[in-house]
Amino acid sequence: LGSLMKLMVMDGQGGGIGAAIIKGIRSTIGLDIEILALGTNSIATSRMMKAGANKGGTGENAIIQTSLTVDIITGPLAILMANSMMGEVTAPMASAVTSSPAKKILIPLTQEKVRIVGVSSEPLPHLVNQVAQILMEMQ
């Protein structure tokens, strides 16, 4: 069990993107990866747990502490942006994710007033498949 890659999936609000990522990873990689669901709120964490995460944590301190111990962090781009997700992502959360030594695989979906040039707008299922593909290549 100690050799499993540790993946932190972070999301906020309703947790839909995080849940989709977890379902996609479980359907492609299966149980060969440890998935930690980190929500900015309990609804997001709960939804990600139901999608198949191994463990879950909620809130600023859980996100800060977990970001130091995982191999990879994934979630929507907004997890890097302080005050995003209607203020749910605090500056310390965004800083912890950004500063973490973990590799980051981010989904370029955001409701913020940010647009990433050179990134095509693909539907979420396609983006989730790309995340799973990258993770399989990293194993």
Regions found by a protein language model. Give the residues of each.
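SAM-dependent methyltransferases
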Residues: 1-8, 27-29, 69, 128-139
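N-terminal beta-loop-helix "entrance" segment that forms/cooperates
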Residues: 33-57, 114-119
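A short helix->loop->beta-strand "cap" motif at the edges of active sites that frequently abuts
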Residues: 31-33, 99-104
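General beta-strand structural signal in soluble alpha/beta enzymes
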Residues: 9, 37-39, 56-58, 75, ...
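Glycine-rich phosphate-binding loop
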Residues: 55-93
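Short glycine-rich anion-binding loops that position phosphate/pyrophosphate groups of nucleotides
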Residues: 13-15, 78-82, 110-112
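Short, glycine-/small-residue-rich phosphate/pyrophosphate-handling segment
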Residues: 106-139
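Glycine-rich phosphate/diphosphate-binding loop of Rossmann-like nucleotide-binding domains
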Residues: 5-39
